[in-house]
Amino acid sequence: RRFSFGVLYAKNWPAWRGVDASGAVESGDYPAELNQNKNLLWKSPLPEKGCSTPIVWENSIFLTSPADGEDAVLGFSMNGEQVWQTTIGPERKGRHLNGSGSNPSVVTDGANLYALFKSGNLACLNMAGKILWKKDLSSYGKDTLYWDFGTSPMLTSEHLVVVLMRKGNSWLLAFDPRTGELVWKKERNYQTPPECDHSYATPTLIKHQGKEAILVWGAERLSAHSAKDGEMLWVSTGFNPKQKKNWVVVGSQVVAGNIAIVPYGRGT
């Protein structure tokens, strides 16, 4: 596995899909073509195959990877030099040839890094790679997703939020980012056709009536929860009216103003 950089974006990219979880950037003069021979600035080897996307904070790049049977977080300089590598705990390998136990992206508040893995390992590190705390979330149930756990952690103004969405063991969890202490938890289990309760989507932070809320997409439902205590504020259903099986939630929702764009099913 190699990590390549073709564009250096001046602003921070602190989480999966960037600042507002849209994956979009301001308009500008960016290369329209990226390949091994054109606009490639550098590439750096990684320990093993992982599927997390990198995040960027100031002059550093962070991502996850398996490393000799362990879950690891890596820090790089902006010229591709690996600065540090920290192992968190034993990895749980991907189920498939192209799978990985290191799919969720790291998230940062600018002071610390937060990383989550298929194994259930959840850790907080400082920007130099020192572990400040870590937890084992396997007590909430093993990952049973066919294509390996991929939901990234997210931050609210107060909490580190983790969503686990799979058959029979789906949870919305909030932790104190300073200590790792569990602040609140909410079950999120629904009866669905086979595999329709599997979700790889990452939650989104929104505003609801002037207060922070967490938007969660999975199990054929888009739900909003209070960021303070996890209580459900509203839920939208009817995404699979014919109750077809194997409609898995893969793509994360995108919020534009007061509209949530929700990809689902086959060609919808």
What are these regions (language model features)?
Residues 3-268:
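Noncatalytic, solvent-exposed loop/strand surfaces
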